[in-house]
């Protein structure tokens, strides 16, 4: 049996042995190999190829490990050093570990000595950051981007916003244009701004319903970089089907303030976040329906409510009278 280049050979000195015993001993031997440093030192796999010789020692089968002939030479019978593997394991357990600093400061990895080249790359070449970004564009899958964009476009709310998708895809837009206007069936229009919705998350339901019913939300100017100096703030031009540009998050940070999630998504990927739009559409529609239902309850006929209360009281009185009659009938039956 074998594992890659690590192989185990079974030899019995006392004739055939039971198959189950052979498999059990083989599993133990393979576990011994895998528990050592084969994963950290692939060059030593060949040295770990071994021969297992079963000897009859007072009725018990005892495996004796011996290096294979092709790697460590022949070791004769009883002159074999049984402590060979144990000494190697002790040396590896006591091996010093060092901290290797990579190209990106702040990322530290603990690696055993001699594994630095494999951690950086199998071709032992250190790439610079500029080379890394250049290579990433060459291997970009443009077909996959097209499929993702088509799926996202299908999730957008239909007939709920007024042509903002076209302006978002065509390049630079002003920060005010990322607001989406949703049209309701009753003719009311609601302007959705992701930055305002997130920053107003601490308000209770009553305040949010009141603001929604009024048809607009108060501006929270200065809360995000994209809301500060809205007239002068411009989104960067984004080449279609290009790799995500995460550096834009640092380039468009104004006075230590980050952009809203909507703008961050756009400057990185070059497309509007379809899932945020879908969530906003469903949330606003649900709140609008709930508020309309509450208005109907408040504006309901007070006479109808009084009649409902009277009917409830009448039913309660009838139940009590029925209980009293049952108690009287039970008393009479006992007498």
Curated annotation (Swiss-Prot):
Sequence ranges of Basic residues compositional bias: 321-335
Keyword Cell division: yes
Compositionally biased tracts (Polar residues): 311-320
GO cellular component: cytoplasm; spindle pole
GO annotation, biological process: cell division; mitotic spindle assembly checkpoint signaling
InterPro entries, per database record: IBD2
Domain of life: Eukaryota
Sorted UniProt keywords: Cell cycle, Cell division, Cytoplasm, Cytoskeleton, Mitosis
Region feature Disordered, mapped onto this chain: 203-225, 296-335
Compartments where located: Cytoplasm, Cytoskeleton, Spindle pole
Function: Part of a checkpoint which monitors spindle integrity and prevents premature exit from mitosis.
Family per record: Belongs to the IBD2 family.
Protein's name in the database: Protein IBD2
Gene name of the encoded protein: IBD2
């Amino acid at each position: 049996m074998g594992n890659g280049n690590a192989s185990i050979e079974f030899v019995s000195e006392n004739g055939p042995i039971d198959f189950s015993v052979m498999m059990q001993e083989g599993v133990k031997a393979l576990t011994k190999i895998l528990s050592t440093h084969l994963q950290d030192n692939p060059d030593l796999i060949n040295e770990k190829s071994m021969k297992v010789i079963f000897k009859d020692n007072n009725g018990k089968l005892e495996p004796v490990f011996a290096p294979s002939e092709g790697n460590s030479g022949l070791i004769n019978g009883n002159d074999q050093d049984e402590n060979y593997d144990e000494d190697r394991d002790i040396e590896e357990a006591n091996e010093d570990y060092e901290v290797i600093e990579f190209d990106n400061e702040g990322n530290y990895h603990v690696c055993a000595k001699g594994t630095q080249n494999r951690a950086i790359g199998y071709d032992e070449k250190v790439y610079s950051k500029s080379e890394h970004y250049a290579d990433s564009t060459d291997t970009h899958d443009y077909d996959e981007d097209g499929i993702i964009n088509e799926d996202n476009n299908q999730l957008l709310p239909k007939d709920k916003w007024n042509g903002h998708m076209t302006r978002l895809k065509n390049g630079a837009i002003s920060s005010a244009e990322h607001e989406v206007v949703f049209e309701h069936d009753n003719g009311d229009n609601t302007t959705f701004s992701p930055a305002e919705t997130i920053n107003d998350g601490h308000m209770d339901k009553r305040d949010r319903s009141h603001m929604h019913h009024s048809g607009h939300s108060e501006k929270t100017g200065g809360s995000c970089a994209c809301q500060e100096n809205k007239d002068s703030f411009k989104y960067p031009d984004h080449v279609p089907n290009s790799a995500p540009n995460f550096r834009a998050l640092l380039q468009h940070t104004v006075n230590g303030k980050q952009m809203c999630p909507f703008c961050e998504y756009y400057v990185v990927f070059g497309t509007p976040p379809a899932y945020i739009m879908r969530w906003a559409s469903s949330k606003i529609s649900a709140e609008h329906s709930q508020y309309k239902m509450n208005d109907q309850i408040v504006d309901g006929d007070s006479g109808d409510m009084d009649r409902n209360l009277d009917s409830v009281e009448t039913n309660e009185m009838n139940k009590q009278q029925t209980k009293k009659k049952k108690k009287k009938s039970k008393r009479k039956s006992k007498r």
